Amino acid sequence: MAELHLSFPAYSLCWINNHQMAVGGGGGTTKSGVKNKLKLLSYEDYEPEVGEGHTKFIEHGEIELKHSDDAVMSLGYFKNELIAGINNTIDGKLIDHLRLYGRKDKLFEEKNALRLTDFDNDEQYQRLCLFEPLHDAICISCTNKSFFIISKNDHKVLFEKHGSDVYDVSSTEDKLAIAVDDRVEIYDWNTFELVQVLYMPVERATVRGVSFLPNQSIVAAYNYIKDSKRFASLVRFDYSSKNQLWRFGMIRDLKNAKGVTCFCCDKENGMIIVAGADCSIRFMSLDLTKLSQVYKHSLPVTDMQLSPDSEALVSVSADGLLCLQFVGKFKNLSAVKLEDAGVILRLSLMFPFVLAILYFYLQLLFPDEKLDAIHRFFSFILHIFSKYTIRNYDL
């Protein structure tokens, strides 16, 4: 675990390799004096000759932004190319919102800028930019309810959707899952034909994250409103090879989360990570069991990403705090399914031990009060048995 306090509010990040990352943010168009920045960082493990080792951050510099640039609101990286959601406004008119940077020595330099849509006001921005390496495509989502998939090579628009809020996307070789408003829409990657729509199991839901899992399952993280309060849940849909459709698998409420702010997932092992509005980060397994829960941020997480090898998680918040956590142990545990051995097996394993304790209890401690002692003994055993064998799924 390592922390770094940045000099600016952080809203976005992406990994460049297993040890290097880009972090973006800033004060926006306000007159706060906080500059809008796109910074490159890396970390390394330091092992001194004497004392305990620790992780330290190394700053590699900043990518120069234009004077008219807004805060960096989204980031993505693939094969020496960095993409960013940065509004550029001159005289109140939006010029562009998608930046493409290429490698130059140890930093990056801007090589192109695009505008795919027009914003109605200064509050709208590009919330998502994500490379899809399997298809050489870039997914772009903006807060004016517009979504685009463009070619990485010539930036031609391959697919677009308007009138809905898109928060996240996930893909396989032939399928595309989009978190759209209160549902997950699944498309065929080759034709962009709608294959299936998966609705959340509650009303007034907003899907904030989606990902494919092993065995073609799909997990979605969503918020919902009930009695004027906001709650958070996970739902898993399992694929039926017979019907070639996804069916409802299981649901898990995230107690006290107060909503989902960020979501990421390790597709290979099934590790699910959810950041809540209560400033928590939850690590979940493939069967939606909570593995761990940590509180490292004082403000809700604005972005978090797994390293390419899924060994480290980096998260940022609007107070400029960057946290690095090593999560390899959760990755290994996420695919392990803990089976209930059953009451009969547990009793058979405990029986010899219980008999030995009973003999000691009666013969040595209470030789003249055997009936009362037997009653007290079995009451005690029943209490211990029920306490440690009844499983609690309340997360």
From Swiss-Prot:
Specify whether Membrane is a keyword of the entry: yes
One GO MF term on file is: guanyl-nucleotide exchange factor activity
What is the superkingdom listed in this entry's lineage?
Eukaryota
What are the protein's UniProt keywords? Endoplasmic reticulum, ER-Golgi transport, Golgi apparatus, Membrane, Protein transport, Repeat, Signal-anchor, Sporulation, Transmembrane, Transmembrane helix, Transport, WD repeat
GO terms of biological process kind:
ascospore formation; ascospore-type prospore assembly; ascospore-type prospore membrane formation; endoplasmic reticulum to Golgi vesicle-mediated transport; protein transport; regulation of COPII vesicle coating
Q: Fetch the SMART domains from UniProt.
A: WD40 (SM00320)
Q: Which GO terms describe its cellular component?
A: cytoplasm; endoplasmic reticulum; endoplasmic reticulum membrane; Golgi apparatus; plasma membrane
- What single Pfam family name could you report for this chain, choosing any that match? WD40
Q: Where does the record place its WD repeats?
A: 250-285, 290-326
**Could you confirm whether the keyword Transmembrane appears in this record?**
yes
Which residue ranges does the entry give as Lumenal-facing topology? Answer: 368-395
Query: What's the protein's topology in the membrane?
Result: Single-pass type II membrane protein
Localization annotation: Endoplasmic reticulum membrane; Golgi apparatus, cis-Golgi network membrane
* Cytoplasmic topological segments: 1-346
Could you tell me what this protein is called?
A: Membrane glycoprotein spo14
Q: Taxonomically, what lineage is the organism?
A: Eukaryota, Fungi, Dikarya, Ascomycota, Taphrinomycotina
